[in-house]
Design a protein with these regions (language model features):
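Active-site helix/loop module of the DD-peptidase/beta-lactamase fold
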Residues: 1-20
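Catalytic loop of the DD-peptidase/beta-lactamase superfamily, centered on the K-T-G motif
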Residues: 11, 23-25, 29-152
Length: 152
């Protein structure tokens, strides 16, 4: 994973990093020069390739032992969402849900101008990585991906 790190101050200074955009009254505004240190992501960034490597290492037990992987991915807390599919359960660091009978284990996050989601489909071996560089654009891509991979 050579393209993953933290850009806590100015993401625009990370070589090759996409600029982040936010919707404002005058259209899209490049906000890549805004510090990320106080945001929920902590300035973390990655690429689809690096996140795929992470998921493959986790599933292939090269990141953790099989027992530890099971511990990390076993649901711990139920959290049904009224009125929608939502998150069924949480594991250690991942959301665990059933979509059309297919198990999906994933994690998402974002900060102004950037959003991302990593979903692992254990029963099929599929991994879906969605990264965007514009606020509020990730959900349609995730819904299309889920529909393709779960038949929903």
């Amino acid at each position: 994973m050579t393209h993953t790190g933290y850009a806590v101050y100015l993401p625009a200074r990370v070589p090759g990093m996409a600029h982040g955009y936010a919707q404002t009254g005058s259209g899209l505004t490049d906000i890549s020069d805004q510090p990320q240190i106080a945001n929920p992501s902590g300035g973390a960034y990655s690429t689809t390739g690096d996140l795929l490597k992470f998921a493959e290492a986790l599933a292939g037990h090269t990141l953790l032992t099989p027992a530890m992987t099971t511990t990390i991915l076993t649901p711990r807390v139920s959290s049904p969402q009224p009125g929608g599919p939502g998150v069924d359960e949480y594991t250690y660091g991942f959301a665990y849900q059933q979509i059309n009978g297919v198990t999906v284990v994933g994690h998402n996050g974002g900060t102004p101008g950037y959003e991302g989601q990593l979903d692992i489909y254990p029963s099929t071996g599929y991994v879906a990585v969605v990264l965007t560089n514009q606020d509020n654009t990730m959900i349609p891509a995730i819904q299309r991906t889920e529909a393709l991979l779960t038949g929903s």
